[in-house]
């Protein structure tokens, strides 16, 4: 009986170690595109650092099930189990948040962007510091180009959220103001 227990314990330890190595490889694959420590340096590719676990899990699930289509992400998530998605999401949430761009930014554009964020109640779902929560993404210090692309996709309906909220909120905002909002969120302090 002791031998069987010892074998079972050793097998469990080996499987746990193998799973941890597999998770590390998957995270390394993520960071190859999304940047070291989850801070993207690649145009139109989002930074992942400190994204809420639940938000990331939902996005990975949507990529895996092709409910959200982006070929590289659909390929990376194909065949991953729910546990794999959970482990990746948890690891991503523990990465440091992305830092702001090196330049402080134009005070007038930042003030206009802050006013737009307040006027459109971005702080209600994304929190007052725009760090996101639960199934709502972190926006603070996200890549400006990615923010602009994504805001435009929500506005036109090319990208769907969990409901129509984002499309409704963004509908009255013109293209120039979308750019200013993205500028502000990338630099919000």
Language model features with spans:
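Bacterial N-terminal signal peptides
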Residues: 6-16
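Protein kinase-like catalytic domain
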Residues: 34, 64, 126, 155, ...
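Gly/Gly-Pro-rich "capping" loops immediately C-terminal to redox-active cysteine motifs
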Residues: 38-68, 74-80, 114, 118, ...
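Inter-heme linker and motif-flanking segments adjacent to c-type heme-binding CXXCH motifs
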Residues: 39-40, 69, 94-108, 129-137, ...
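C-terminal capping alpha-helices of c-type cytochrome domains
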Residues: 78-100, 145, 171-189
């Amino acid at each position: 009986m002791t031998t069987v227990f010892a074998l079972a314990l050793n097998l469990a330890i080996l499987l746990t170690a193998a799973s941890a190595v597999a998770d590390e490889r998957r995270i390394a694959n993520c960071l190859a595109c999304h940047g070291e420590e989850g801070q993207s340096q690649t145009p139109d590719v989002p930074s992942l650092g400190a994204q809420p676990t639940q938000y990331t899990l939902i996005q990975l699930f949507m990529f895996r099930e092709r409910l959200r289509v982006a070929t590289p992400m659909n390929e990376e998530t194909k065949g991953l189990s729910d546990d794999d998605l959970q482990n990746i999401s948890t690891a991503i949430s523990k990465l440091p948040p992305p830092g702001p761009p090196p330049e402080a930014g134009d005070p007038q554009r930042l003030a206009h962007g802050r006013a737009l964020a307040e006027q459109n109640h971005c702080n209600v779902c994304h929190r007052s510091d725009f760090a996101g929560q639960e199934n709502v993404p972190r926006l603070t210090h996200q890549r400006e180009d990615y923010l602009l692309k994504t805001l435009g996709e929500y506005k036109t309906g090319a990208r769907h959220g969990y409901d129509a909220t984002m499309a409704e909120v963004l509908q009255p905002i013109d293209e120039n103001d979308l750019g200013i909002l993205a500028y502000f969120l990338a630099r919000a302090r």
